[in-house]
Swiss-Prot record:
Highest classification ranks of the organism: Bacteria, Bacillati, Bacillota, Clostridia, Thermoanaerobacterales
Family statement: Belongs to the UPF0122 family.
Organism: Thermoanaerobacter sp. (strain X514)
PANTHER family per the UniProt record, alphabetical: UPF0122 PROTEIN CBO2450/CLC_2298, UPF0122 PROTEIN YLXM
Protein's name in the database: UPF0122 protein Teth514_1714
NCBIfam families: PRK00118.2-1, YlxM
Function: Might take part in the signal recognition particle (SRP) pathway. This is inferred from the conservation of its genetic proximity to ftsY/ffh. May be a regulatory protein.
InterPro entries per UniProt: RNA_pol_sigma_r3/r4-like (IPR013324), UPF0122 (IPR007394), UPF0122_fam_protein (IPR054831), WH-like_DNA-bd_sf (IPR036388)
Amino acid sequence: MDDDFLFMTLLYDFYGALLTDKQREIFEMYYLNDYSLGEISELLDISRQGVYDTLKRAESSLEFFEEKLGLVKRHQEIMNKLDKIKKGIEIIRERERDPEILKIIEEIAREIEELNL
């Protein structure tokens, strides 16, 4: 799978509910169920060009929502920061011997795991 494909499905996870029913249906068939444009065309009894146009409108809408709202970018930033914090906690766990500090570190680690989105 290429990065564009994965990014588009991530956008769909965040903003898919904002698409029209027809856009959602075609997007899911194409991206999530791996149907070709021709297969979707046959199943929905619309032209291949109609499927293509609807899919492109859905993709453009998802990109527009991300441009305006930035939820995916923010989510990725949060996940990257959580990963850095987890790595820091592991380093502290390996080096720290004070039981009280280790207890605090374990509590912080549990809180971070609960945040894992």
